[in-house]
Regions:
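Short alpha-helical elements
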Residues: 1-316
Length: 316
């Protein structure tokens, strides 16, 4: 019976719909390896105390690569992915694999390196057009909120367009090419406009930033305008009509591209699930999923052509 289950799980991993090519594995590993060499060289040079003499069997770049491949391939069960897919099909890439329990411990130690790699090597560049939005990250079902102990004191009850939830919010800023420019994680009860008041969150943004009606705030518009950012939002039904450029009106309608990015992060990269057993595992899962999305060859994007015109349109 054990052999039959093994074959079934092995075939399930082998027939995964999101095929991972050898070139993509090599691309991810080379980027992670080059970064880890420089990062840990600086870290060891400036760290206090003695460095451990015994090094893990797997290198830092191998661990980060496996973490990213899991989300890139749209796998659902990490234990089966590591035990069967990595240990057998990718044996030539990772010849010195450790046990599953040991690998989970090593994953948590790579959070700092993965965070720095994500911000320095994986995020996109500003193109002058950016979109901002938030999406809920549920950690449990609503009927189990009082019984949840993993995120006690960390997660909070918030409300989105889909109703109430218990968990966190992922705030994203993307450009018109679908590339993630920056992100931040907050408790579920934090206002969507609050992260925009942090200059570190919007330091890569210039020119125009498009958002939905939930970001309407006169003081926020003035605050961002000082930093060279023009926040453009829709208007509510009880507000007066305003004049805006035709280009802004068209791009405001294209704001749904960031909803598509959120959908791919949740359904393809599995950024949201309720099987976390620690907060560090939750952070590791989100960072790995965002890094995997950055390696997608084709991202949601908008196509447009700018024609210079001084015409203004009435936004109705």
């Amino acid at each position: 019976m054990g052999f039959i289950i093994f074959v079934a799980e092995y075939q399930q991993i082998k027939l995964n719909p999101m095929n991972i090519t050898h070139d993509k594995i090599t691309e991810i590993f080379y980027l992670a390896d080059d970064f880890c060499k420089e990062f840990y060289a600086v870290l060891d040079k400036n760290s206090l105390g003695k460095n451990p003499k015994r090094k893990p069997m797997m290198s830092h770049s191998e661990i980060i690569t496996i973490m990213i491949i899991f989300h890139y391939g749209s796998f659902r069960n990490f234990k089966h992915f590591y035990s069967y897919y990595v240990s057998f099909q990718l044996r030539s890439y990772f010849p010195k694999t450790v046990s599953y329990n040991r690998f989970v411990e090593l994953m948590e130690k790579e959070v700092l390196a993965l965070t720095m790699m994500l911000h320095t090597c994986c995020l996109g560049k500003d193109t002058g057009i950016a979109f901002v939005d938030s999406t809920p990250i549920r950690v449990c079902k609503n009927k189990r909120i009082k019984r949840n102990k993993v995120f006690k004191g960390l997660a909070a009850i918030g409300k989105s367009t889909m109703g109430w939830f218990h968990g966190f919010k992922l705030h994203l800023i993307i450009n018109d090419k679908g590339e993630i420019l920056n992100f931040v994680i907050t408790p579920g009860n934090v206002d969507d406009r609050q992260p925009l008041k942090d200059k570190k969150f919007v330091e890569k943004i210039r020119h125009k930033l498009y958002a939905d009606k939930g970001y309407i705030d006169k003081n926020l518009v003035e605050l961002l305008f000082i930093d060279g950012i023009h926040l453009i939002t829709g208007i509510r039904n009880n507000m007066k009509n305003t004049l805006m450029e035709l280009q802004d009106k068209i791009l405001l309608r294209k704001r749904s591209v960031i909803e598509t990015v959120n959908d791919e992060l949740k359904n393809m990269c599995q950024i949201e699930h309720s099987r976390h057993r620690s907060f560090s595992n939750f952070i590791t899962n989100i960072l790995s999923a965002i890094a995997a999305y950055c390696f997608f060859p084709k991202k949601p994007a908008i196509k447009y052509e700018i024609v210079k015109s001084d015409q203004l349109s009435l936004f109705i």
